[in-house]
C-alpha cells in the first residue's frame, strides 16, 4: 500500500492558501446578501406604506422569492466552507476533495449525534437542554453547533487526508477502492472518530472564542477600530480573511437570539435579522463590524486620495494616469475592491498606508458611535443603497455621506501634503512611470485585456511557476527561483503591485480582472508545458 506524500508547506503559506479558499463562499454570501437585502426591504411594511405600489401581490411574491433565495447561503454557511476549503487547497482532483469535504462534515455531525444519544442527552425536545448543550439541527442532524470554525477544521482535515491518499495504491483485491475513491472512504472513517472527540474538546474552543468576543466587546467603541485597522494591515499579506471570518461567523463577533434561535457572528446575526419578519431595526453591536465601517474610507477617503494623486501628477502625465485612477475608483466605490487604489501608494509610501489603515479603523468607530446600522460585507455604494437607504431612516444612512465627505477632505489633504512634501513617486510623478504606463497601454492584450504572455515571461516563464491561483484581486504564485521574477516588467504590464512574501511565494496585484488573467495564464502554461 503506497501513497503520494503532499508537498510540505510552511505555516505562512498554509494560512495564505486557507484565506484564499474563503473567497468562493464569501462571493456567494455577498450576492445572496444583496438579494436578501432588496427582497426584505421592499417587502417591509414601512416601505410599502411609503410606496403603496410595491404592495402589489405579484411584486410581493417576487420580493419574497428574492428573500428566500438570498437566505440560502446563510442557512448552509458551514456546509459551503467545509466544501470550499478542500476544493481550494487541493492541488489535484479538486472535485473529489470537495465531495469528501461534504461527506466528512456530515459524518462528523452524525458521530456527534451518536455520542449525544449514547450519553442520554438526545433525543429531546427540551429547549433548555438543547440550549445548554448548544445543540442545533445541522443538515437535519441534531448535533453540537460548531459553526464556521467546526466546518473549517473539518475541511482542513479532509484536505490533509486527500493530499495523503488521493494517489494511494491498494492490493489487487481492493484496487477498486484505491486512488480518488479512497479519499471519501478514509474521510468518513477519520471524521467519524473526530465527531466522537468534538463533544469533549469543543467547550474549550467555545470558551476561547467567547473570551475573544468578550475582549472585543469590552473594548467598547474602540473594538470596531481594532478590527477595521487590523483588517487593512493584514490585507497586503492576504491574511485578513482569517480575521474577517472570525468576526463575521463566530462568537467573536457576538451572539444574539433572533426569531427564537441563537445566532453567532456579526454577519450571521445581521442576515438572520434581515430574514426575520418580527425584527424591527438591526443590531448595532453586529453592524459595527460590517459594511458601515468601511464606507467613510471606501466612499470618501480613497476617492480623496485618488484625486490627490491625480493633482500631484505632472500636468503632462495626468491624462495618462486618469484611466488607472478612474478604474480603481470604480472598483472601490461600486465593487468594494480597494487594492487597485491602495497598491498605488502602499509600496512607495508604507506610512501612508498605515495612516489609511488607522483612518479606516476610525471610520468603523465613528459609524458605531453615531448609531448607524448598515450591514453586509463590501462597504460599497450598493450596500449603502440596499442596506441603508432602502431600509429607511432607522439605519441612519444619512450620516454616511456626511462622514464620507469629511474623510474625503482628510485623505485629500494628508495625501497631497505627503506626496508633495516628501516627493513620493505616486503614478505620474516622474517620466519613468509615465513611460511605463504608455508601455502597458501599448501592450498586446489578450482576452483578459492584459498582455498575459509578457506577464508570464516576467514571472520567469512557465517552468519557473510551481503553483498558480488567485483571490479577488491578486495572482498567488509559488516559484522555483525568485531571482527570475522581473518586478518592473510586471508593473510595465499593468500589475498594480508585487508582494514578495518569501523566497518562493509572491502575489501579483492585478485588480478585478484577475480571474481572467489567471485562467489565460493557466491555459498558456498548459500549452507551453504540453
Curated annotation (Swiss-Prot):
Record-linked InterPro entries: Glu_permease_IIB, PTrfase_EIIB_Cys, PTS_EIIC, PTS_EIIC_1, PTS_Glucose_EIICBA, PTS_IIB_1, PTS_Mal/Glc-sp_IIBC_component, PTS_maltose/Glc_sub_IIC
Pfam families membership: PTS_EIIB (PF00367), PTS_EIIC (PF02378)
Catalysed reactions listed for this entry: D-maltose(out) + N(pros)-phospho-L-histidyl-[protein] = alpha-maltose 6'-phosphate(in) + L-histidyl-[protein]
Induction and repression of expression: By maltose. Repressed by MalI.
Active site residues according to the UniProt entry: 471 (phosphocysteine intermediate)
Keywords associated with the record: Cell inner membrane, Cell membrane, Kinase, Membrane, Phosphotransferase system, Sugar transport, Transferase, Transmembrane, Transmembrane helix, Transport
Domain of life from the UniProt record: Bacteria
Membrane topology: Multi-pass membrane protein
EC number assigned by the record: 2.7.1.208
Cellular location(s): Cell inner membrane
TM stretches of this protein: 22-42, 69-89, 96-116, 138-158, 189-209, 289-309, 321-341, 343-363, 369-389, 399-419
One term under GO cellular component: plasma membrane
A GO molecular-function descriptor: D-glucose transmembrane transporter activity
Domain PTS EIIB type-1, residue spans: 449-530
PTS EIIC type-1 domain segment(s): 1-431
Major localisation: membrane
GO biological process assignments: carbohydrate utilization; D-glucose import; D-glucose transmembrane transport; maltose transport; phosphoenolpyruvate-dependent sugar phosphotransferase system
Role summary: The phosphoenolpyruvate-dependent sugar phosphotransferase system (sugar PTS), a major carbohydrate active transport system, catalyzes the phosphorylation of incoming sugar substrates concomitantly with their translocation across the cell membrane. This system is involved in maltose transport. MalX can also recognize and transport glucose even though this sugar may not represent the natural substrate of the system.
Domain notes: The EIIC domain type-1 forms the PTS system translocation channel and contains the specific substrate-binding site.
Name recorded for this polypeptide: PTS system maltose-specific EIICB component
Amino acid at each position: 500500500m503506497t501513497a503520494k506524500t503532499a508537498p510540505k508547506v510552511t505555516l505562512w503559506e498554509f494560512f495564505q492558501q486557507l484565506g484564499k479558499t474563503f473567497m468562493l463562499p464569501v462571493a456567494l454570501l455577498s450576492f445572496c446578501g444583496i438579494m436578501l437585502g432588496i427582497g426584505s426591504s421592499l417587502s417591509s411594511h414601512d416601505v410599502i406604506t411609503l410606496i403603496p405600489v410595491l404592495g402589489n401581490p405579484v411584486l410581493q411574491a417576487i420580493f419574497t422569492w428574492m428573500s428566500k433565495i438570498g437566505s440560502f447561503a446563510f442557512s448552509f454557511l458551514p456546509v459551503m466552507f467545509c466544501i470550499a476549503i478542500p476544493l481550494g487547497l487541493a492541488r489535484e482532483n479538486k472535485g473529489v476533495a470537495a465531495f469528501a469535504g461534504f461527506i466528512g462534515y456530515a459524518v462528523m455531525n452524525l458521530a456527534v449525534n451518536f455520542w449525544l444519544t449514547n450519553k442520554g442527552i438526545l433525543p429531546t425536545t427540551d429547549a433548555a437542554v438543547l440550549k445548554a448543550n448548544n445543540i442545533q439541527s445541522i443538515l437535519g442532524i441534531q448535533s453540537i453547533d460548531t459553526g464556521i470554525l467546526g466546518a473549517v477544521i473539518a475541511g482542513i482535515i479532509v484536505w490533509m487526508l486527500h493530499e495523503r491518499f488521493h494517489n494511494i495504491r491498494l492490493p489487487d483485491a481492493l484496487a477498486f477502492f484505491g486512488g480518488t475513491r479512497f479519499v471519501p472512504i478514509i474521510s468518513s472513517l477519520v471524521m467519524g472518530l473526530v465527531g466522537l472527540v468534538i463533544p469533549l474538546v469543543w467547550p474549550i474552543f467555545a470558551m476561547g472564542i467567547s473570551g475573544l468576543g468578550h475582549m472585543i466587546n469590552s473594548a467598547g467603541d474602540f473594538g470596531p477600530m481594532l478590527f477595521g485597522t487590523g483588517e487593512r494591515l493584514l490585507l497586503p499579506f492576504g491574511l485578513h480573511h482569517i480575521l474577517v471570518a472570525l468576526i463575521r461567523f463566530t462568537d467573536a463577533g457576538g451572539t444574539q437570539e433572533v426569531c427564537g434561535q441563537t445566532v453567532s457572528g456579526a454577519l450571521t446575526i445581521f442576515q438572520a435579522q434581515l430574514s426575520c419578519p418580527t425584527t424591527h431595526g438591526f443590531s448595532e453591536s453586529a453592524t459595527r463590524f460590517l459594511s458601515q465601517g468601511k464606507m467613510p474610507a471606501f466612499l470618501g477617503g480613497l476617492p480623496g486620495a485618488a484625486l490627490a494623486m491625480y493633482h500631484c501628477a505632472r500636468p503632462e502625465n495626468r491624462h495618462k494616469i486618469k484611466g488607472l485612477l478612474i478604474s480603481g475608483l470604480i472598483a472601490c466605490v461600486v465593487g468594494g475592491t480597494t487594492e487597485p487604489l491602495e497598491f498605488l501608494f502602499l509600496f512607495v509610501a508604507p506610512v501612508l498606508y498605515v495612516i489609511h489603515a488607522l483612518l479606516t479603523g476610525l471610520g468603523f468607530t465613528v459609524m458605531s458611535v453615531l448609531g448607524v446600522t448598515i450591514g453586509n460585507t463590501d462597504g460599497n455604494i450598493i450596500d449603502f443603497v440596499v442596506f441603508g437607504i432602502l431600509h429607511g431612516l432607522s439605519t441612519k444612512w444619512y450620516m454616511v455621506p456626511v462622514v464620507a465627505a469629511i474623510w474625503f477632505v482628510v485623505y485629500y489633504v494628508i495625501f497631497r501634503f505627503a506626496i508633495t512634501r516628501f516627493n513620493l513617486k505616486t503614478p505620474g510623478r516622474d517620466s519613468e512611470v509615465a513611460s511605463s504606463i504608455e508601455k502597458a497601454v501599448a501592450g498586446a492584450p489578450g482576452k483578459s485585456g492584459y498582455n498575459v504572455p509578457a506577464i508570464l515571461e516576467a514571472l520567469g516563464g512557465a517552468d519557473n511557476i510551481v503553483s498558480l491561483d488567485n483571490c479577488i484581486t491578486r495572482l498567488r504564485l509559488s516559484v522555483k527561483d525568485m531571482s527570475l521574477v522581473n518586478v518592473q516588467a510586471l508593473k510595465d504590464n499593468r500589475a498594480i503591485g508585487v508582494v514578495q512574501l518569501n523566497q518562493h511565494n509572491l502575489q501579483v496585484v492585478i485588480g478585478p480582472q484577475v480571474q481572467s488573467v489567471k485562467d489565460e495564464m493557466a491555459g498558456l502554461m498548459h500549452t507551453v508545458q504540453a
